[in-house]
Amino acid sequence: MDVSGEPTVCSNAYANEMKLSDSKDIYVLAHPVTKKTRKRPRGPPLGVKLDPPTFKLNNMSHHYDTETFTPVSSQLDSVEVFSKFNISPEWYDLLSDELKEPYAKGIFLEYNRLLNSGEEILPSTGDIFAWTRFCGPQSIRVVIIGQDPYPTAGHAHGLAFSVKRGITPPSSLKNIFAALMESYPNMTPPTHGCLESWARQGVLLLNTTLTVRRGTPGSHVYLGWGRLVQRVLQRLCENRTGLVFMLWGAHAQKTTQPNSRCHLVLTHAHPSPLSRVPFRNCRHFVQANEYFTRKGEPEIDWSVI
């Protein structure tokens, strides 16, 4: 109580109210009792070695090392991947080391998980690497880059922009054919959309994402196929000269930037009907053959047979 006779009120958060009589209240400060806490030692005890930490991704039955993102469970080695996915042995030297990388193992692990969960994935397992089966890395002459496979069942078969025989060509492929006929008016018009005849002559028709969930374009971008494809293109650029790159649209142009002193790099808008620039005026097919002629090499027969 102060000299005026009024009760003393303490505003401290630790004050406790105590009633000492019926007539007067006095508030007394109760100082907090500080309890010394014992700090836990950092790290494991001396001489104790712990296993690497692991975690589980949602809905996944496999564990990963948190530092390297490497699957702890055993994975397919590169030879088994070549067998399961029907990859041409001609590509072994270029692909085998890359398929051993942790990110590549993660791609196949997630692919298998999706497949086992019942997801319908396009194209079929045996066609994902179909682009390797028509010519080896040393026979590649032209590179055409797409985005991801057609999401309609029966269309995709492992070659960018191409569809199986008997399937009506999609709009983008129709626009490619329109440009082809504009450049070669005497050519027999294509009667189907299968571009295997191009692939056999060394035209690499490569999507940056190799799989897709049926009916959902872009659904497998997250798997990491793009990194694998970029490494394939990088190694081709490093090991070869005189290739022709047809980069249609911003996506393809961002995927790879070949050295124009070593290769012919051609750019144009994407053949999609949504592009602002009509694809009909694209002269890449003629320009590629003119380039080969100057080098004394045979032209590509762009007929779709």
Curated annotation (Swiss-Prot):
It is found in: Host nucleus. Its EC number is 3.2.2.27. It holds the Pfam family UDG. GO terms for cellular component: host cell nucleus. PROSITE patterns: U_DNA_GLYCOSYLASE (PS00130). Keywords: DNA damage, DNA repair, Host nucleus, Hydrolase. It catalyses: Hydrolyzes single-stranded DNA or mismatched double-stranded DNA and polynucleotides, releasing free uracil. The active site is at 148 (proton acceptor). One of its GO terms (biological process) is base-excision repair, AP site formation via deaminated base removal. Excises uracil residues from the DNA which can arise as a result of misincorporation of dUMP residues by DNA polymerase or deamination of cytosines. Therefore may reduce deleterious uracil incorporation into the viral genome, particularly in terminally differentiated cells which lack DNA repair enzymes. This is Uracil-DNA glycosylase. It comes from Varicella-zoster virus (strain Oka vaccine). The lineage of its organism: Viruses, Duplodnaviria, Heunggongvirae, Peploviricota, Herviviricetes.
